[in-house]
Curated annotation (Swiss-Prot):
Disulfide bonds: none annotated. The lineage of its organism: Archaea, Thermoproteota, Thermoprotei, Desulfurococcales, Desulfurococcaceae. This is Small ribosomal subunit protein uS8. The keyword Transmembrane helix does not apply. GO terms for cellular component: ribonucleoprotein complex; ribosome.
Length: 133
């Protein structure tokens, strides 16, 4: 089976386990992008600790869930956003968050992954890859 979007698969796994009320989720395969997105989600308080498990093939990530995620997912197609777009949140980005101050958009910038709030502070644009609220 071919897996086309590992980030979308990881976020769907987290959301499904959160809806079921599970306390942890196992994400496979693991990647640096998924680990960086989880680090941002952990810093914002959406997930707890996570650890990499080497299984000899692709690796797995075990994530402790805190029950604070209402919805999360990958943004497809990836949307390019400028600094000015982040200030106003245009319609094609507004549909991912329930309100301007609720939730986060995860942006891939030239300075690494960050939330849309950090991107506004640093005055950089990038590509929106995921949302969490």
């Amino acid at each position: 089976m071919v897996m086309l979007d590992t980030l979308a698969n990881a976020l769907t796994t987290i959301y499904n386990n959160e809806v079921r009320g599970n306390k942890e989720a196992i994400i496979m395969p693991a990647s640096k992008l998924i680990a960086n997105v989880l680090r941002i989600m952990q810093k914002e308080g959406y997930v707890g600790e996570f650890e990499y498990i080497d299984d000899g093939r692709w690796g797995k990530i075990r994530v402790r869930l805190l029950g604070r995620i209402n919805k999360c997912g990958a943004i497809k197609p990836r949307v390019s956003v400028s600094y000015r777009d982040l200030l106003v949140l245009p319609e094609h980005l507004r549909r991912f968050l329930p309100s301007k101050d609720v939730g986060i958009l995860i942006i891939s910038t030239s300075q690494g992954l960050m939330t849309h709030k950090e991107a506004i502070q640093k005055r950089v644009g990038g590509i929106a890859i995921a949302y969490v609220y």
